[in-house]
Amino acid sequence: MLLMVTTLAAYSQKTSLTTVNSVRPKRGDKMAFEAAYKQHIAKFHKEAQEKINVYEVLSGPYQGYYHLVNSGQSYEGLDKDRSDATAHDMDLDKTFYPLLDETMNGTYRFMDSLSIHSDVQAEKFVVNVRHIKPSLEADYRAESARSAKVQGKLKGGFWDNLSINVFEQLWDGNDPTVVSIRNLKEGFKSLETDFYGVASVGAPTFKDEYVKEYGTADWDKRVKLMDDAVVKHEQYIMKFRKDLSSQ
């Protein structure tokens, strides 16, 4: 299943939710879909609480999907209905859904303790979706928090520019899912080896700093856990579509 979200600043605990509608236009209807959605956005998604950001998947088995993202939500907000719900839904039924081949929905919670330099703004992204073994979910989260803490301390061109936002999918049954989004503020070109410069000779690596903080035995446990805990791993790149998003 496709699971994805957006780049976000660190929200407060009360507005840490993001809802995502992932859609795939029918073959041959890509441009018609974009035109119809622009009109829908202009009519129904102007207010702050209703604004939508749109992202287009550019690689992998979900290439051609769009993520329609409503971020900064709260649990309380999930109880509220739109005042224009009937007109909104009728517009979708008439101009939006007929152009789609598939649609999937999900709700995600931002994980500040697992994220690194989360306030970076970008328009290009690398997305990693990991499906976690339920029995190892708690251990995986704890270890991910450790890793983020160590990575946040590392210095140098690459580490100073590393920005990752992490989310957990809510209400995902027996398939715990963690989504990490690397924000590429310099674009896809920053994925080139040594784009931010070659590391200084003798500069501590992630492993060096981890072992310094937690010890060699814990490093060995980490390597095994991060491999054993992940049942399935998906990766793709995506870009922000400002032209399709709320203005």
Q: Positions of the model-derived regions?
A:
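Bacterial Sec-dependent N-terminal signal peptides
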Residues: 1-15
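Short S/T/G/P-rich N-terminal loop/turn motif that feeds into the first structured element of a domain
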Residues: 12-247
